[in-house]
Amino acid sequence: MKVLWFAVNPSLYDAHRNGEHNGGGWIASLEKIIRTSDNIRLGVAFEHPDPIFKKEIDGVCYYPIRVKPGLRRRIYASEKDKIIIADCLKVIEDFKPDIIHVFGSEWGFGLVEKYVDIPVVIHMQGSLPPYVNASYPPGYNFFTQWKTSHYNPIVLLKRRFVWSRNDNYKVAREIDILKHCRYVMGRTNWDYNITRLYAPDSQYYHCNEALRPVFFNPPKTWTFRQRKRIQLLSVGSCSMVKGMDLLLKTAKLLKDHTDFDFEWLIAGPTGSFSFFEKNERTPHDAVNIKFLGTLSAEDLAVQLAEADIYVHTAYIDNSPNSLCEAQIILSLIHISEPTRRRGI
């Protein structure tokens, strides 16, 4: 069977030259599993700057899709999609798959379903319609961002003529993709409910995500430690929905109003963390927060084993792999609203 993926990252394509990557590890982990199957011929298509049509590595046929430069293509998602879809159809014609697997309904790849008779399954990741409804955390809005730019008029123009247009287009695009899809895969109640809303006639399959192998057999094992200073660990980025403002507020409350002795480690890119520090008027080092930077899978597994509690701060997330990886290694605080179960 020939299976073609349209993926949001290069999976293992760059592994031979860059080493293991960190973001989107579920796709690379799944590819490693698929490679062990003798009866599946895998193709992987993705955006990439390499100026080649295809390249075969270790039995997998990779299709790096290079978006040609152009001002409108760089600015507007709708213009970029026109180029991407044309290239996707060329990939389909060359690979001739039996099944097409699209990672994420919120990306433009799912539009290919309109143009082919081959079965296309949409693999749910996030979902933009509910995300856009909660774009900013409490106390934040566009003017918070604008103030941080020192009221730069270019930022205001981008908001009016680019960002809003792209947001509206992407929401409409995802709804259109789901309404046309015949097959969908998900793993949460949220996935199921969203697809029943926008694609009630589609066939739904439950599909758990593949985690990075090192977390199943970590280099260090978590054990309970009786120590004075508790070590908290969070993994994430500094986008608005990831709860960095909440993390800062919580750390400040703990530092100023309790005797709780803690150190709060953050793994992941924190280049934009200063935005939240300015708005909360709280420097991270004043409230026992320490940045670890982006870690390899092995180093992150060790950090999880050394932490006492994992804290996931995101306002919106859909069974994120960072949380799933943490659950394998250590105890954590997590509120699961659909099941009404709370606790450590």
Roles of regions detected by a PLM:
Residues 315:
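Aromatic "clamp/platform" in nucleotide-sugar-dependent glycosyltransferases that forms part
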Residues 196, 210-229, 302:
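Acidic anion/phosphate-binding donor-loop and adjacent secondary structure
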Residues 333-344:
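Single conserved hydrophobic/aromatic residue that forms the stacking wall/gate
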Residues 4, 215, 223-242, 248-251:
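Conserved donor-binding/catalytic core segment of Leloir-type glycosyltransferases
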Residues 29, 128, 145-184, 193, ...:
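Membrane-proximal helix-turn-helix segments that form the acceptor-binding/catalytic region
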Residues 92, 294-295, 302-307:
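Short alpha-helical donor nucleotide-sugar binding micro-motif in glycosyltransferases
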Residues 1-51, 252:
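N-terminal subdomain of nucleotide-sugar transferases
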Residues 268, 276-298:
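Nucleotide-activated donor-binding/catalytic signature segment of Leloir-type glycosyltransferases, i.e.
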